[in-house]
Amino acid sequence: MENEKTEKKKKDRTPKTWKTCEIIQQLEYMSAEDVESGLDHNAIKNYAYILHDKDVNDDGSPKAAHWHIYIRFKDSTPTDSICKWFGITSNYIGRIQGRFADALAYATHKNVSSKYQYLDEEVKSNFDFVKERDTARSREADKQRKAEIADLIINGVIREYNYTCLLYTSP
Protein backbone atom coordinates (compact mmCIF):
# COMPACT_ATOMS: atom_id res chain seq x y z
CA MET A 1 0.00 0.00 0.00
CA GLU A 2 2.78 2.44 0.99
CA ASN A 3 4.71 1.52 -2.15
CA GLU A 4 1.65 2.27 -4.31
CA LYS A 5 1.33 5.74 -2.76
CA THR A 6 5.01 6.45 -3.39
CA GLU A 7 4.70 5.28 -6.98
CA LYS A 8 1.60 7.42 -7.50
CA LYS A 9 3.38 10.50 -6.11
CA LYS A 10 6.29 9.92 -8.52
CA LYS A 11 3.90 9.68 -11.45
CA ASP A 12 2.08 12.81 -10.34
CA ARG A 13 5.32 14.82 -10.54
CA THR A 14 5.60 14.28 -14.28
CA PRO A 15 4.05 17.25 -16.05
CA LYS A 16 1.05 16.51 -18.22
CA THR A 17 2.42 18.82 -20.92
CA TRP A 18 5.78 20.26 -21.92
CA LYS A 19 7.00 23.46 -23.61
CA THR A 20 10.63 22.28 -23.46
CA CYS A 21 12.14 18.99 -22.39
CA GLU A 22 15.23 16.84 -22.37
CA ILE A 23 15.28 13.16 -23.18
CA ILE A 24 18.25 11.05 -22.12
CA GLN A 25 18.34 7.48 -23.37
CA GLN A 26 21.10 4.94 -23.90
CA LEU A 27 22.08 4.12 -27.46
CA GLU A 28 21.38 0.47 -26.67
CA TYR A 29 17.66 1.28 -26.41
CA MET A 30 17.29 4.07 -28.99
CA SER A 31 18.89 4.21 -32.44
CA ALA A 32 19.65 7.32 -34.48
CA GLU A 33 16.65 6.41 -36.65
CA ASP A 34 14.43 6.28 -33.53
CA VAL A 35 15.63 9.76 -32.56
CA GLU A 36 15.01 11.18 -36.02
CA SER A 37 11.54 9.65 -36.34
CA GLY A 38 10.66 10.89 -32.84
CA LEU A 39 11.61 14.42 -33.86
CA ASP A 40 9.60 14.29 -37.08
CA HIS A 41 6.45 15.93 -35.70
CA ASN A 42 4.83 19.28 -36.41
CA ALA A 43 4.49 20.08 -32.70
CA ILE A 44 8.27 20.47 -32.43
CA LYS A 45 9.61 23.97 -33.00
CA ASN A 46 13.33 23.37 -32.32
CA TYR A 47 15.45 20.38 -31.46
CA ALA A 48 19.09 19.56 -30.90
CA TYR A 49 20.54 16.16 -30.13
CA ILE A 50 23.92 14.55 -29.68
CA LEU A 51 25.30 11.12 -28.90
CA HIS A 52 27.57 11.21 -25.84
CA ASP A 53 29.88 8.28 -26.47
CA LYS A 54 33.07 9.55 -24.84
CA ASP A 55 31.83 10.30 -21.30
CA VAL A 56 33.51 8.61 -18.35
CA ASN A 57 32.43 7.76 -14.82
CA ASP A 58 34.20 9.18 -11.75
CA ASP A 59 36.40 6.08 -11.62
CA GLY A 60 37.52 6.62 -15.24
CA SER A 61 35.50 3.77 -16.73
CA PRO A 62 33.53 4.62 -19.87
CA LYS A 63 29.85 5.49 -19.51
CA ALA A 64 27.38 3.74 -21.77
CA ALA A 65 26.80 5.72 -24.96
CA HIS A 66 23.64 7.80 -24.60
CA TRP A 67 21.59 10.45 -26.38
CA HIS A 68 20.86 13.93 -25.11
CA ILE A 69 17.81 15.26 -26.94
CA TYR A 70 16.60 18.82 -26.30
CA ILE A 71 13.20 19.86 -27.62
CA ARG A 72 11.30 23.14 -27.70
CA PHE A 73 7.65 22.76 -28.71
CA LYS A 74 5.40 25.21 -30.57
CA ASP A 75 2.71 24.73 -27.92
CA SER A 76 2.36 22.66 -24.76
CA THR A 77 2.67 19.03 -25.80
CA PRO A 78 1.26 16.08 -23.84
CA THR A 79 3.67 13.68 -22.17
CA ASP A 80 1.82 10.73 -23.72
CA SER A 81 2.48 12.06 -27.23
CA ILE A 82 6.21 12.43 -26.60
CA CYS A 83 6.35 8.91 -25.15
CA LYS A 84 4.67 7.49 -28.26
CA TRP A 85 6.94 9.37 -30.65
CA PHE A 86 10.13 8.08 -29.03
CA GLY A 87 8.90 4.72 -27.73
CA ILE A 88 9.81 5.60 -24.14
CA THR A 89 8.13 5.90 -20.77
CA SER A 90 7.62 9.27 -19.09
CA ASN A 91 10.53 8.80 -16.68
CA TYR A 92 12.95 9.39 -19.60
CA ILE A 93 11.54 12.87 -20.18
CA GLY A 94 13.01 15.54 -17.95
CA ARG A 95 12.85 19.23 -17.27
CA ILE A 96 15.59 21.34 -18.71
CA GLN A 97 17.45 22.79 -15.75
CA GLY A 98 17.84 26.51 -16.37
CA ARG A 99 17.30 27.95 -19.81
CA PHE A 100 17.14 26.14 -23.13
CA ALA A 101 20.52 27.71 -24.00
CA ASP A 102 22.03 26.14 -20.86
CA ALA A 103 20.98 22.73 -22.14
CA LEU A 104 22.50 23.53 -25.54
CA ALA A 105 25.79 24.37 -23.82
CA TYR A 106 25.67 21.04 -21.97
CA ALA A 107 25.20 19.16 -25.24
CA THR A 108 28.88 19.76 -26.01
CA HIS A 109 29.91 20.23 -22.34
CA LYS A 110 30.84 23.87 -23.00
CA ASN A 111 29.62 24.69 -19.50
CA VAL A 112 31.42 21.76 -17.79
CA SER A 113 35.13 22.00 -18.60
CA SER A 114 35.98 18.89 -16.56
CA LYS A 115 34.02 16.68 -18.99
CA TYR A 116 34.90 15.58 -22.50
CA GLN A 117 34.38 18.48 -24.92
CA TYR A 118 32.26 17.39 -27.86
CA LEU A 119 32.48 19.24 -31.17
CA ASP A 120 29.66 21.53 -32.25
CA GLU A 121 29.51 19.55 -35.50
CA GLU A 122 28.41 16.46 -33.55
CA VAL A 123 25.13 18.16 -32.59
CA LYS A 124 22.24 17.71 -35.00
CA SER A 125 19.64 20.47 -34.89
CA ASN A 126 16.98 22.19 -36.97
CA PHE A 127 18.16 25.70 -35.98
CA ASP A 128 21.43 27.55 -35.37
CA PHE A 129 22.04 26.13 -31.91
CA VAL A 130 25.57 27.58 -31.72
CA LYS A 131 24.25 31.11 -32.21
CA GLU A 132 21.54 30.68 -29.55
CA ARG A 133 23.95 29.06 -27.09
CA ASP A 134 26.69 31.64 -27.58
CA THR A 135 24.31 34.62 -27.49
CA ALA A 136 22.95 33.47 -24.14
CA ARG A 137 26.47 32.85 -22.80
CA SER A 138 27.52 36.33 -23.96
CA ARG A 139 24.53 37.90 -22.20
CA GLU A 140 25.45 36.01 -19.04
CA ALA A 141 29.06 37.22 -19.27
CA ASP A 142 27.78 40.81 -19.69
CA LYS A 143 25.62 40.45 -16.57
CA GLN A 144 28.56 39.10 -14.59
CA ARG A 145 30.81 41.95 -15.76
CA LYS A 146 28.19 44.56 -14.80
CA ALA A 147 27.88 42.99 -11.34
CA GLU A 148 31.67 42.98 -11.00
CA ILE A 149 31.85 46.69 -11.94
CA ALA A 150 29.06 47.54 -9.49
CA ASP A 151 30.97 45.75 -6.71
CA LEU A 152 34.15 47.66 -7.58
CA ILE A 153 32.24 50.96 -7.41
CA ILE A 154 30.57 50.05 -4.11
CA ASN A 155 33.93 49.00 -2.62
CA GLY A 156 35.58 52.26 -3.70
CA VAL A 157 38.01 50.70 -6.17
CA ILE A 158 36.48 52.46 -9.16
CA ARG A 159 36.22 56.20 -8.60
CA GLU A 160 35.45 59.25 -10.69
CA TYR A 161 39.16 59.93 -11.29
CA ASN A 162 40.21 56.39 -12.30
CA TYR A 163 37.26 54.75 -14.03
CA THR A 164 38.66 55.30 -17.53
CA CYS A 165 41.91 53.56 -16.61
CA LEU A 166 40.13 50.64 -14.99
CA LEU A 167 37.27 50.13 -17.43
CA TYR A 168 38.70 51.04 -20.82
CA THR A 169 42.17 49.49 -20.83
CA SER A 170 43.03 46.83 -23.39
CA PRO A 171 43.78 43.36 -22.05
Predicted region positions:
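Conserved small/polar residues in nucleotide/adenosyl-binding loops
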Residues: 168-171
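Residue-level recognition of strand-loop junctions within catalytic nucleotide-signaling folds
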Residues: 74, 159-162
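DNA replication initiation modules
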Residues: 74-146
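Signature for HUH/AEP ssDNA processing cores
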Residues: 1-65, 72-77, 81
